[in-house]
Amino acid sequence: MPAPTFDELAQLPPPTLRQLIRRGDYAGHTSGLGQRHLQANLVILQKSWADEFLRFCALNPRACPLLDVSEPGSPHFARLGADIDVRSDLPRYRVHRRGQEPVEVNDIGAFWEADFVAFAIGCSFSFEQALRDAGIGLRHLELGRNVAMYRSSIATRPSGRLAGPTVVSMRPMKAADAIRAIQVTSRFPLTHGAPLHLGDPTLIGIRDLARPDYGDPVPLAADEIPLFWACGVTPQAVLAEAQPELYISHAPGHMLVSDRLYDEL
């Protein structure tokens, strides 16, 4: 049987999509998948870091809107779906060890530890369908790419050992669409809400839009302006500075697709 096309994947209900991912039949980005369902960034930390990270999320709700937290040792997010297993249900993960480059894998069962605490953080992929419903085109989806993400000069509010830059995702739009996008996304605070910035990227420390720190470059037309949303990759930038001995995250753009609708929580 041939592998499903991306358009076919986009029509699948989340449990079916997760089954494909769990079997290793899909390992690509999730922008455009799940239709109107919440997507989540993932952070998995040893319990000794969990309280600090929980407070970090509370202090930085635009970048880290918390959707669910697992019990220590549990790989499940009961609030987001009955059969979710965070060890296998994301297309791609990053395993981070102190002093080493992250390793990307498609399953983290072999790395799981009894004191791990998993955090699900809202993702802007969740409101992309609402933008499309409003007639707003999304260039990265039109090109079949991941969204472009950048480390900005906007500082997060620190929590203990955790401090660092806010990562932002960028979507180019014409001015009229930008106004409508602000109106639409402001309704969804659990998926980063309205943009943090629009216009000149140098004002938030971004020198070259053609060279994103994460994801894929997305071209900007002459009559468009860039809009920047807070991004759930922010914890990866912050944890890279804090240097826990071990933590696991999603690979940027490769999210957990939940059973919850984006306007349900």
UniProtKB/Swiss-Prot annotation:
Pfam families for the chain: D-Glu_cyclase
Q: Signal peptide location in the record?
A: none
Q: Which Gene3D superfamilies match?
A: PSTPO5379-like, PSTPO5379-like domain
Instruction: Provide the top EC class.
Output: lyase
Enzyme Commission no: 4.2.1.-
UniProt keyword Magnesium, yes or no: no
Entry keyword set: Lyase
InterPro entries for the chain? D-Glu_cyclase (IPR009906), Putative_hydro-lyase (IPR038021), UPF0317 (IPR016938)
Q: Which GO terms describe its molecular function?
A: lyase activity
Q: What family does the entry list?
A: Belongs to the D-glutamate cyclase family.
Output this protein's name.
Answer: Putative hydro-lyase PSPA7_3193
Write down the species: Pseudomonas paraeruginosa (strain DSM 24068 / PA7) (Pseudomonas aeruginosa (strain PA7))
